[in-house]
């Protein structure tokens, strides 16, 4: 059973009891990410996430590591474009200590100047890793072109220039205005009792500043076009995509079914026609990225540089086919079954259930039950898939980016026509 409530401080708590397991995963989710940064402070949200593990006013970094190791637990965090998450998985008997550790991290970071300088170097190396990983880099270049005039287009890590300019004082100021009760969701799933956890949370977070949630940013608009980044590597990497619906859109499940048919499974059209039938690529797939007010559907392929134009032409053909013709009944059935199975299999652990609870609270403000989701997927028709494809796959908002050698034929905007 899922229980959700807002505590007097403004902090939101949502739990799901899973009596058949012995573990508990609890996460502290911050409803602020890289899209809420200014241009000058790009990367600050991710930098702060790193620093929370470098010591608090009551624990050193070593003591943090020793505490979680002594529990036999797992502690981790990540920063996304619309939120950040700090989470721990432990046996149920260790929940009080784990929650105390989490609250210490998100309420009392030290931001010691020496640690800030050292971690700054670590993050700059992390940025270089992306630059040296072309399959990651092409997605970054794609997002930067796709939403070139909006914070969603900026890299979560920031740029070398913005990260190098951030100081301990700037990190403290960002932390003070952002890490406040109304921005937090505490989500937990596993062998737990909601009332007992509520008492633990209230005690652990009783000094969390009330504050006020920050202002939202305006929805983004797409900048269509083609961007090529030359790299001396063995193959070319391609991203091609269009806008998609936001997270809570009424047609989101029809969009998920459409994406499954397009390129999100082994039997998908892109995988079969580009890899299996023609051997043009090892990796080829489509994926959806959805936010509170925007989204994008992206096709990725890694192929021989001289084959890029052929892969693009085949991809555009598949987009056109989805837009102009209804999918056959057997293909629709297979896509819906795949989507439902993936959903259920992906929510068997306490960690995945905790993340699901938190995202539901952040994007919907309520818990959408499994039965609701399964029924919504099952209700998708071939007409729905075609209607959504016709709505999303438009020539006036196509974006393509490539990362690869200079030897290949250059893509042009004129060649991007569905």
Regions found by a protein language model. Give the residues of each.
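Flexible, small-/acidic-enriched active-site or ligand-binding loops
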Residues: 225
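Active/ligand-binding-proximal structured segments within catalytic/core domains
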Residues: 10, 17-68, 179, 250-262, ...
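Extreme N-terminal starter segment of soluble prokaryotic enzymes
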Residues: 1-3, 11-12
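Charge-rich, well-structured scaffold segments of protease-associated domains
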Residues: 2-6, 17, 54, 61-219, ...
